[in-house]
Amino acid sequence: MDSTPLAQPLVVDTDNKTPKHDLENGASTADTIEEHPAKKPRLENAPVTEKEEADAAPKRVKGIAPVKAEFIVQKSARPQPVEADNTVDADDAAEAASHQQRESEQKGKKKTSGQNKGRDFGQHNDAKGLCPSRAFSPEFSPKECKFGDRCRFEHDVRTYLKEHKRADLTTFGGICPLWEAKGRCPYGYKCRFVGSHMTERETADGRKELVLVEDETRKKAQPLVPHASEDGIVNAVSMEDKVAVARRKIKTPRSDAYLTWLDKTSKALEKNLHGRHFDDDAEGEVGADVKVSLEDVRAAYVEPPFLPSEKRRLYFGPETPALAPLTTQGNLPFRRLCTDLGAQFTYSEMAMGMSLIQGQKSEWALMKAHETEAIPPTISSGANIVQGYDNSQDLKFGAQIAANKPWHAIKATELLGRLTPHLRVIDLNCGCPIDQVYRDGAGSALLDHQSKLEKILRGMNAVSEAIPITVKIRTGTRDASPNALKLIERLTLGGHESSMLNIGPPGVAAITLHGRTRQQRYTKQADWSYIAECAALIKRLNEKTDEVTDTVREPDARTLPNGGKVYFLGNGDCYSHKDYEDHINNAGVDAVMVGRGAIIKPWVFEEIQTGQYLDKTATERLAYVEKFAKYGLDTWGSDEHGVGTTRRFMLEWLSFTQRYVPIGLLDYLPPNIQDRPPAWRGRNELETLLGSPNYKDWIKITEMFLGPAHKDFKFEPKHKSNAYEPQG
């Protein structure tokens, strides 16, 4: 897309050289300084031609944000130390930060640069906790503590408030956001805003008793959806169920039956198609001159124990931008903020299938969604909707899992369908580039094992009940050999084995393609021309599904998602409504999934909705940070631990938002997410603060809403050069 100049031509130096500026954030000056030939002086009052005006306008340089000259900060002529560009590390980690390899450092040496692998955020708890038996009871009539004198927690409420708990926060007007929204605070005396919902009352004997206050009117507010909890959360798995999963008390009969069939079928195929023989005591061996006819293969085929259940029909369209699954950044408060701003579909952070099967609390917690994610998406009245789609039964939130073995993915899918039924889709991650995930055989490693991937998706589709199955892939693992076209054809029609057995496609309802290889990571721009090729292929395959079907044995309708239509989404570098419209119109995708662009500026969904650039003021942007703080306290709690957790995730987010250069400061639009700006200042102090790459400024921003950091709080961002520890 052509870049459009926004301002009057900048005045060049008298020596006809482009002004030189030191660059920040890893932007190189190697390709930015160029010598211009001397121009003929123009006669006074001579008309300015379009060519002269274009020549005089500042040139857009690839990789460098075109900040207007008046906002560029001139550095001193003395050589400045160069900061390492840590954005690629951070962007990679946004895909699977919690699953990276924890490499041990050499003894006696502590690295001060590079990625933080095993990240430590310190402690943020009360000096001495309040006993749960006292947390919600009136001061003089507490519940009985089963530990009695052996209890290690404080039993005197006034002593706890005076000596062990930090002073109340004064932000948000000193009013607890949870109490203000719901009429009660689930953290009682431990709340950092307890003064707003606690009072003293006089008892019959004249003593003053501390009691908690509730607002009965606010408590009567009903959830948006009937299956949400009182706190507005859906898909909250009980502790009893997590323990039952961990102890294998919750059975997965469909998965067990399907996996038994899959194992037998796979061995039969290996024997008949490739001459490999399996027995209990020996490895498979290749037989000589094995030739089996198609009829013999189909005769040996055993039907699966059951067919997939009929799936809910899906819809993806130009009016339904999706927020990509994002590890760490894709937490519930951030998804909730993006939903407010127009995101129509959201996904959980990537959960590991094996961890779900083992009942790990942290992994099952990723399935929680806010009630605003459990309402139907907004779609156009003139949308081209597949037959049978019911918008009233649709919702916005889906789960994403990763697995390296079929049984991991299939069992996890059955458990998700049983314990968290309010999911739009279950998406299989086949794009994660992180080394540890790749080496384990999950994520993008599955791109090179397409037969295995097809088995996984077919099995997931078989056991997911009514929940559709989708998949997210990359263009390939290596730059020299992209294989997404071949894979997409296989996922749409079925591979060689399924063709031989005439069992139809694996049942994928939608495919999302990230336009980069694993090898590229985020070092290059997404390849939307390749995405367009894949979109054209999907369109042809959707049109010809009936033609390639064996008319002798028509597949059951339950094996065909959306009546045979596979949706196709593109992903990569969408940073404005112009990018979105270009991808919809020129790449031919059904919808676009937005990842980093939404982290850096979540109002990109609002731009897509309104079809225009939105030059948000610093005050408006700070209001989004405030909203995130409220949503964070609502999610993680308003006690000391919850405030610390909210601060940690807010800092993670601010490490991305500081990359945003306001569009009012740019010479050219549209902005490019890959561009790195020179040192710049904002239109006011707050705008400059929000764009600061200094972690100390990020801490200041969190303190505007969460008060001073706990004395034991640490912040270890994705890159070690930005680490923070309390001083003193």
From Swiss-Prot:
Its cofactor is FMN. Residues 14-24, 33-58, 117-127 have a biased composition (Basic and acidic residues). GO terms for molecular function: flavin adenine dinucleotide binding; mRNA dihydrouridine synthase activity; RNA binding; tRNA-dihydrouridine47 synthase activity; zinc ion binding. GO terms for cellular component: cytoplasm; nuclear periphery. Keywords: Cytoplasm, Flavoprotein, FMN, Metal-binding, mRNA processing, NAD, NADP, Nucleus, Oxidoreductase, Repeat, tRNA processing, Zinc, Zinc-finger. Catalyzes the synthesis of dihydrouridine, a modified base found in the D-loop of most tRNAs. Specifically modifies U47 in cytoplasmic tRNAs. Catalyzes the synthesis of dihydrouridine in some mRNAs, thereby affecting their translation. This is tRNA-dihydrouridine(47) synthase [NAD(P)(+)]. The gene is dus3.
